[in-house]
Curated annotation (Swiss-Prot):
Binds 2 magnesium ions per monomer. This is Anthranilate phosphoribosyltransferase. It is an enzyme of class 2 (transferase). Keywords: Amino-acid biosynthesis, Aromatic amino acid biosynthesis, Glycosyltransferase, Magnesium, Metal-binding, Transferase, Tryptophan biosynthesis. Mg(2+) 1 binds at S94, E228. It comes from Clostridium beijerinckii (strain ATCC 51743 / NCIMB 8052). It comes from the Bacteria. One of its GO terms (molecular function) is magnesium ion binding. Its cofactor is Mg(2+). The gene is trpD. SUPFAM superfamilies: Nucleoside phosphorylase/phosphoribosyltransferase catalytic domain, Nucleoside phosphorylase/phosphoribosyltransferase N-terminal domain. Belongs to the anthranilate phosphoribosyltransferase family. It catalyses: N-(5-phospho-beta-D-ribosyl)anthranilate + diphosphate = 5-phospho-alpha-D-ribose 1-diphosphate + anthranilate. Disulfide bonds: none annotated.
């Protein structure tokens, strides 16, 4: 299907199929659509409401055009990321979580970018932490397999996304592309901890991850708006496990955490956030550590390294207290040139 036909269907409130969306996104990724066509298509999808099958088709199209990180042993291979856009101004929680999870045996393919709506994106804080974000697919494969975590810089691996960057910026609204970054990991991950900016997305993203073949995944949305498992209130969770989906609430107090406020977990610029992460990895206690431990417990769970989130929380605490997590950070920051 060509993009003009898709726009006509959307204008008539007709639903596009997975294959139709995949075809149109492929056309866009190849630079074969005009700005007007791209804008019309994205707005049409948004107004009609993107379905799980349409999101799945778009993810497959991004992967069709991206660079792949070929990892044979996918056991314990995960990503920890969020859609962003929650406006919370927290520090880079999922980045700290990735390091803790890697220290506990997870293989983390951390897919991300620089800041869009926040002061500090994942790439920004990793640079401040001294962790190389520029490895290619061969180097990243080696690092993930041998050291447990590599950062897959989105523009390097999904460069064709640049074909919609201008239109997305000009539209100034959330589109299907706000969801695609966390879903289009270049590595064949089997587990994922993914935060979303809107609780209405939980079930749909759960269906997408199920259809992508993930063994374990948790899609999370704090009831305070956070795209993480929060410690200020409960969190709504959609869990994918063994081919099934279940939805539930998670209360931090029932897991042994003291409730905090959003101000307690606020961050700042990339340099400040890097300092926060290092302090946590060195054992500093408080709400910032608590939210990292809680989410790290979930990451270890989706990596299939523990049988429950409770066991994951216990293991994450031990990894920080034993300095294993900080040692993993030192190891990762020492990897500057890989041949």
């Amino acid at each position: 299907m060509i993009i003009n036909d898709a726009i006509k269907k959307l204008a008539l409130r007709e639903e596009l199929t997975e294959d139709e969306v995949r075809g149109v996104i492929n056309q866009i990724m190849k630079g074969e659509a005009t700005s007007s066509q791209i804008g019309g298509f994205l707005v049409g999808l948004r107004v009609n409401g993107e379905t799980p099958r349409q999101i799945l088709g778009a993810v497959k199209a991004i992967r069709d055009n991206g660079v792949k990180v070929e990892i044979e042993n996918t056991e314990h291979l995960i990503d920890t990321c969020g859609t962003g856009g929650d406006g919370s101004k927290t520090f880079n929680i999922s980045t700290a979580v990735a390091i803790v999870a890697a220290s506990g045996g997870a293989k983390v393919a951390k897919h991300g970018n620089r800041a869009v709506s926040s002061k500090s994106g994942c790439a920004d804080v990793l640079v401040e932490l001294g962790i190389n974000i520029d490895f290619d697919e061969i180097q990243s494969k080696k690092i993930i397999e041998e050291n447990g975590m590599a950062f897959l810089f989105a523009p390097k691996y999904n460069g064709a996304m640049k074909n919609v960057s201008k239109e997305r910026k000009e539209l100034g609204i959330r589109t299907i592309f706000n969801l695609l970054g966390p879903l289009a990991n270049p590595a064949p991950i089997t587990g994922q901890l993914m935060g979303v900016y809107d609780g209405a997305l939980l079930k749909d993203i759960g269906e997408v991850l199920l259809n992508l073949g993930l063994k374990r995944a948790m899609i999370v949305h704090g009831d305070d708006g956070l795209d993480e498992i929060t410690i200020t209130t409960s969190t709504s969770i959609c869990e994918v496990k063994d081919g099934k989906i279940k939805n539930y609430k998670l209360d931090p107090e029932k897991l042994g955490f003291k409730k905090a406020t959003l101000d307690d977990i606020k961050g700042g610029e990339a340099k400040e956030n890097a300092e926060i992460i290092i302090k946590i990895l060195k054992g500093e206690r408080g709400p910032k550590r608590d939210i990292v431990v809680l989410n790290s417990g979930a990451a270890l769970y989706v990596a299939n390294l523990v049988d429950s989130i409770e066991d994951g929380i216990k293991k994450a605490s031990e990894l920080i207290d034993s300095r294993a997590a900080y040692k993993k950070y030192e190891e990762l920051s020492s990897l500057q040139v890989i041949v």
